[in-house]
């Protein structure tokens, strides 16, 4: 598994599409993604616990973990996702 414990901010897109070797435990201190967060078909089952801002879109698959989809919808409703939620397939 990829481990990036010091990563707190991403100044652009965070694309982990199809990458099963990265999950929410890989980026435990991630707070901000200024661009798109593309996490469809990845190892994510939850949003990173400290993530509080996504400046772009969240792109996910309807076949991804239902709990993750619920968390994303809640974050969107709370205004944490500026670009909205988009399904890729």
Language model region names:
Residues 1-3, 9-46, 50-69, 76-89:
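Concave beta-strand-loop units of leucine-rich repeat
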């Amino acid at each position: 598994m990829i481990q990036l414990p010091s990563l707190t901010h991403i100044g652009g897109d965070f694309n982990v599409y199809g990458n099963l070797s990265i999950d929410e435990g890989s980026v435990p201190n991630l707070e901000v993604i200024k661009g798109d967060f593309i996490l469809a078909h990845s190892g994510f089952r939850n949003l990173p616990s400290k993530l509080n801002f996504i400046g772009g879109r969240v792109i996910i698959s309807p076949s991804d973990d239902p709990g993750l989809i619920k968390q994303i919808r809640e974050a969107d409703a709370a205004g944490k996702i500026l670009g909205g939620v988009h399904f890729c397939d």
